[in-house]
Structures are given as C-alpha cells and as structure tokens.
Regions:
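Acidic (Asp/Glu-rich) sequence patches and key acidic residues
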Residues: 1-93
Length: 93
C-alpha cells in the first residue's frame, strides 16, 4: 500500500502489505464495494472521495479479515485526507 501524489511520487508507504486470502473475494460486493474491488493481480486506486467509504468498510470489517494491514490502511487513508491530489494505491503483483 502506498499513497502517491498526482505525479505518481510516493508520499507515504505501509510497512507491510495486505496478505491475500480466500476470505477477501468472499466479501459481499454490496456491503463492501471498495474492499471487494481489491485484486491480488492488479492495482486498486482510491481517491479522496472514495477514502471515507473505504474507512467505513474497514470499521465494519469482520475480525477474521483483520490484521496489521487494516491499521496501516487507516493511517494511509489519513495521509490521503490530509492533502490534495493524493491517492491510496493497493498494489497487486
């Protein structure tokens, strides 16, 4: 996970990453559309208007899906919200 500015320069990075499990694709796309969009094979990018929705989903995420990545994602969401033209990237392989 990384926050990038509009020119692609990294502003902040997570210490770790999201460990992909079979649980993530099982999320209900109606209740978790932001998290459901994540893929281990491609990038997912969230802008400043999508980040509040992502934060709401992280708050509702069942405990089985948790881990250090959730706190790191929250921290990076705050970085996006604290500036302009910032984007949170979940980088796939």
């Amino acid at each position: 996970m990384v926050v990038r500015g509009d020119r692609g320069r990294a502003v902040a990075r997570a210490q770790g990453g999201l460990e992909w499990t079979d649980l993530l694709p099982a999320l209900d796309p109606v209740n978790f559309p932001m998290l459901w969009a994540l893929s281990p094979y491609g990038d997912a990018v969230f802008n400043e208007r999508q980040v509040p929705l992502l934060l709401e989903e992280l708050d509702r995420l069942p405990e089985a899906y948790g881990g250090a990545w959730v706190d790191q994602a929250r921290d990076l969401c705050q970085v996006v919200q604290s500036g302009t033209h910032r984007y949170l990237w979940f980088v796939g392989d």
